[in-house]
Amino acid sequence: MRVSTIRSGRICRLALCLLVLLPLLYLLANWSDHHKRVQEAYHTRFGGPKFAHQRLEGRPREVPKLVDGLGNFEPKDVKPRSGPGENGEAHSLSPDKKHMSDASEMEYGMNIACSDEISMHRSVRDTRLEECRHWDYPFDLPRTSVIIVFHNEGFSVLMRTVHSVIDRSPTHMLHEIILVDDFSDKENLRSQLDEYVLQFKGLVKVIRNKEREGLIRTRSRGAMEATGEVIVFLDAHCEVNTNWLPPLLAPIYRDRTVMTVPIIDGIDHKNFEYRPVYGTDNHFRGIFEWGMLYKENEVPRREQRRRAHNSEPYRSPTHAGGLFAINREYFLELGAYDPGLLVWGGENFELSFKIWQCGGSIEWVPCSRVGHVYRGFMPYNFGKLASKKKGPLITINYKRVIETWFDDTHKEYFYTREPLARYLDMGDISEQLALKKRLNCKSFQWFMDHIAYDVYDKFPGLPANLHWGELRSVASDGCLDSMGHQPPAIMGLTYCHGGGNNQLVRLNAAGQLGVGERCVEADRQGIKLAVCRLGTVDGPWQYNEHTKHLMHRVHKKCMALHPATQQLSLGHCDVNDSYQQWWFKEIRPRW
């Protein structure tokens, strides 16, 4: 009897287990089939492998491979689209809407009325090298947070940026898009934006500053909020191109201390035509001149020889600042951006120098292309942020950067180019210097010798200034002025305002007379503002403090002011002519 009871109990328990297990086995089988269908759908869309492989620690990571056919993330069977602006073509509004175009350009610095007639999902021409279409990339590249900072951006331009990222990124790599609102006051960027992003079901998040912080600090906040392994920063007026993300992530997958930069295409701010900025086979990289203006130079042969293929990434000393990818944890280990930098300007150099000098590297990626709208003008000012510092904010930022990362010799080049910067209060940089010491960072001389060696080819070290300040006429007491013109342009004499800028003139020990990054030259037309000859720091000018003559040594004539016309020219030197006499007045900031 007892044996029969035990057997009956075992049979009941077995039946109960089967009742529980059978549904689980059914669900597992269906999940496996669903997973297979997802992989096949992914393979159809992107040409990628059918099964993902988890990363294994200690196992060498896959590297990109050049293949005969299309690369694994290249889109297949893309149907052509028709409509305004499709394929990146220019779009023009009808003549009766000209007033709308003009009004939106005044408000946004770009033609938002034109943008509003173009699809959020518009196609753009593939501007990549042909070779870029034939790279296979590792499937398990890091999941990415795309961070987009905006302030009073045109709604359609902002959302086209978002849609282009979603439409042209492998789904499993795009972790999230974070829109960081730097205290916008336009109504359509409040409730309308919040409602619009609901369609993305959590993929797109909006966070808002409670006061205006500026681009730099707002980006750092976005990095803090992000949860992806890699963060990609984009400006709020971009359109990413075909297969832009995998080539941007692959170098970081190989080495977490690499920062990658896409090649930037241009989008016209009036008609939204998408077009490449660079020639197809020409590669450029970011450098700088000693006033800390961003410049670009063709990639030197020394760098070209490091690569086997023309479409592979290459090293760059710096970058323009708006668009790049970096491992999130590494970015935070570097201290993110210097919190003492205000609004924008100089953050691209600060991050570049910090990365290179502290053990990382920067690579530009030819197979990653992103279009960027270059505004006609900046439609908003710095607001209350401008009152937080006395003096030009961007120059203050530059001073913080050079005082942290430059050696003494290179600091002098900056102060030679920007003499008034010596008198700016840059704030406390002790934390930045402590970070530099803690990370055991290399010297700036090392950076110039091994990474930015081509800077000297275009921008040699600057000789000291013999004289600087306002160049005043003895006869009229007016000041030499570039008049805000771009070279080539005739210079004039205007009221001395004491603020420097277009009236801040420098004469260096090699005879170069300069205003900002431009040089002062002379010909039959008069005294002209000209582009300085690259690779040179000398000039034809000589100042005699006794006679107050500024002589052109080639023409053997002196700078003169015409008494009647007030025009500037060269004349035969006459020690008794006060219209040929000049004096430099060093100025001090009125900050």
From Swiss-Prot:
Enzyme Commission number(s)? 2.4.1.41
**Pfam families reported in the protein's UniProt record:** Glycos_transf_2, Ricin_B_lectin
**Entry comment describing in which tissues the protein is expressed:** Expressed in developing oocytes and egg chambers. During embryonic stages 9-11, expressed in the primordium of the foregut, midgut and hindgut. Expressed in the salivary glands from embryonic stage 12 onwards. During embryonic stages 12-13, expressed in the posterior midgut and hindgut. During embryonic stages 14-15, expression continues in the hindgut. During embryonic stages 16-17, expressed in the antennomaxillary complex. In third instar larvae, ubiquitously expressed in wing, with increased expression in the notum and ventral wing pouch, eye-antennal, leg and haltere imaginal disks.
For the keyword Membrane, the answer is yes
Chief subcellular location equals: Golgi
GO biological process terms, semicolon-separated: protein O-linked glycosylation
> Region Catalytic subdomain A: what ranges?
141-251
Residue ranges for the region (Catalytic subdomain B) are 313-375
User: Coiled-coil stretches, from where to where?
Assistant: none
Domain Ricin B-type lectin per the UniProt entry, residue ranges: 466-585
Q: Which Gene3D superfamilies match?
A: 2.80.10.50, Spore Coat Polysaccharide Biosynthesis Protein SpsA, Chain A
Q: Which reaction does it catalyse?
A: L-seryl-[protein] + UDP-N-acetyl-alpha-D-galactosamine = a 3-O-[N-acetyl-alpha-D-galactosaminyl]-L-seryl-[protein] + UDP + H(+); L-threonyl-[protein] + UDP-N-acetyl-alpha-D-galactosamine = a 3-O-[N-acetyl-alpha-D-galactosaminyl]-L-threonyl-[protein] + UDP + H(+)
The phenotype of cells or organisms lacking this gene is:
RNAi-mediated knockdown in the whole body or respiratory system during development is lethal. RNAi-mediated knockdown in hemocytes, amnioserosa, mesoderm or digestive system and reproductive tract causes no defect.
Spans annotated as Disordered: 68-100
The UniProt GO MF terms for this protein read: carbohydrate binding; metal ion binding; polypeptide N-acetylgalactosaminyltransferase activity
Q: Which residues lie on this side of the membrane: Cytoplasmic?
A: 1-11
Q: In which pathway does it act?
A: Protein modification; protein glycosylation
- Family matches, as SUPFAM superfamilies: Nucleotide-diphospho-sugar transferases, Ricin B-like lectins
Q: Which residues bind substrate?
A: D182, R212, W344, R375, Y380
Per its database record, what is this protein's job?
Glycopeptide transferase involved in O-linked oligosaccharide biosynthesis, which catalyzes the transfer of an N-acetyl-D-galactosamine residue to an already glycosylated peptide. In contrast to other proteins of the family, it does not act as a peptide transferase that transfers GalNAc onto serine or threonine residue on the protein receptor, but instead requires the prior addition of a GalNAc on a peptide before adding additional GalNAc moieties. Some peptide transferase activity is however not excluded, considering that its appropriate peptide substrate may remain unidentified.
Q: What is this protein called?
A: N-acetylgalactosaminyltransferase 7
